[in-house]
UniProtKB/Swiss-Prot annotation:
One of its GO terms (molecular function) is structural constituent of ribosome. GO terms for cellular component: cytoplasm; ribonucleoprotein complex; ribosome. This is Large ribosomal subunit protein bL33A. The keyword Ribonucleoprotein applies. The keyword Glycosyltransferase does not apply. Belongs to the bacterial ribosomal protein bL33 family.
Length: 49
């Protein structure tokens, strides 16, 4: 199974704080609640292109 790295960006400030490895079979974007160091709180992070 092939995989690739993608970035997760904060929906509030737009900073790209995290990178994750996903399989190429995944069609929908990943949305996860994570801690943003710039905002100082937990916010929703979404997969960027």
């Amino acid at each position: 199974m092939a995989s690739h790295k993608v970035s997760l960006a904060c929906t509030v400030c737009g900073s790209r704080n995290y990178t994750v490895t996903l399989s190429k079979d995944r069609t929908e974007r990943l949305s996860v609640s994570k801690f943003c160091q710039h905002c100082g709180k937990h916010t929703l992070h979404q997969q960027t292109k």
